[in-house]
Amino acid sequence: VAVIGTGSSGIQSIPIIAEQADQLTVFQRTPNFSIPTHNGPIDEERLAEYRADPASYREEARHSGIGVPRTPPDTSALAVSEEERQAAFEAVWQRGELAFLQPFNDMGTNAEANDTMRGFIHDKIRSIVDDPEVAELLCPTDHYFATKRPCLDTGYFETFNLAHVRLVDLHADPISTITETGIDTSGRDGDESMEFDAIVFATGFDAMTGAIVGVDITGRDGLSLRDAWAHGPETYLGLMSVGFPNLFMITGPGSPSVLSNMMVSIEQHVDLITDTLEHLRDTNADTIEPTELAQTKWVQHSNDIANLTLLPTANSWYMGANIPGKPSVFLPYPGGVGAY
């Protein structure tokens, strides 16, 4: 089996495919950060916390940063000792939850602080993967930690210690042809033809906008949403767009969406949409859409917040950078669920 891609789809599927395939070859363009997910039963103490007051827990989630109740860290990664930093990072590694990935308050805004976490994960990869050359290939160096969506895995890095698993670096050995029987590469050390029974394309998604513009949505005066968003999506709150009366989106571009606990965001958006529909009914109005000014100010507000962070520095699907020709703009709202 060949797997092309080492983003979330590849990272989650590669360990399982390795259990079943006689030979697995992984073609990697860009290594990504991942931490072990530690799947298993939730411990009783945590369950008791959830069950003690579900209504308060859910209300806290609505006003939290990412839709999961937690106390935000108030300390810089650069203000503590190396021992304290390592202990905090180890706790993140052992917990394995996206909601608790940043134990310090400047991980997302300060490159030097972020580098401390990046170095910790690099060291973890080197300690797990037996072959030093393979380990270095698996260490992400082109983006800061969590500027692409971090992955959770079940033995991903350990998989590359298996004798029947091979990693191909596409920078050194790019794919030249997909053939009837497999994959041909042409690299620095010459050409190679590899035969496979199956090829898995774990090459990503047109995130945030692809599913929406994939539908032929037409607004006022025959304007298509695809054309309206040709230079990047523009919305008010990520829920409505100028020129498309009565078109509502849930977790659309310009909303917290993928930077949040999606269940909480979905509920918020459904509440706003139903409140809006009730208002239309109660005022005998037929249509609603945002003004140009409201939409422009919302887009600018979202961009201003993103530019305070390290998020726009990565060529990520948050930016639309994984799709050739797609405008590079920061797609989700980065200000947090509570602020939103």
What label would you give each PLM region?
Residues T6, Q20-Y340:
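N-terminal FAD-binding dinucleotide-binding subdomain shared by FAD-dependent oxidases/monooxygenases
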Residues S9:
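Hydrophobic/small residue at the entry helix of a nucleotide-binding pocket
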Residues S13-I17:
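Aromatic pocket-lining residues of Rossmann-like dinucleotide-binding sites
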